[in-house]
Amino acid sequence: MGMSFSHLLIVLLIIFVLFGAGKLPQVMSDLAKGLKAFKDGLKDDGSDNDKNK
C-alpha cells in the first residue's frame, strides 16, 4: 500500500498550510540540502568500509 496521488496531494496541502507560502521555499531548500548531506554521508561511509577490508 503505497501513497497514492491523492494522499500526496493532501500531505502537500497540509505542509503548505503549516509553513505558508513565504516560508515554503526555504523549507524545501533546507530539506534538499539535508538529503544531499545524508546521501553524501552514506557514500562516504560505504567507501571507508571498502578501504578497511
Curated annotation (Swiss-Prot):
Question: GO CC terms on record?
Answer: TAT protein transport complex
Its keywords, alphabetically, are: Cell inner membrane, Cell membrane, Membrane, Protein transport, Translocation, Transmembrane, Transmembrane helix, Transport
- How is this protein positioned relative to the membrane? Single-pass membrane protein
Q: Where in the cell is it found?
A: Cell inner membrane
Q: Which GO terms describe its biological process?
A: protein transport by the Tat complex
Residue ranges crossing the lipid bilayer per the database entry: 1-21
Q: Does the keyword Protein transport apply?
A: yes
Which Cys-Cys disulphide bridges does the record give?
none
Entry GO MF terms: protein transmembrane transporter activity
Q: Does the keyword Transmembrane apply?
A: yes
Q: Which family does it belong to?
A: Belongs to the TatA/E family.
Provide the function of this protein. Part of the twin-arginine translocation (Tat) system that transports large folded proteins containing a characteristic twin-arginine motif in their signal peptide across membranes. TatA could form the protein-conducting channel of the Tat system.
The protein's name: Sec-independent protein translocase protein TatA
**Source organism of the structure:** Rickettsia africae (strain ESF-5)
Instruction: Give me the gene this protein comes from.
Output: tatA
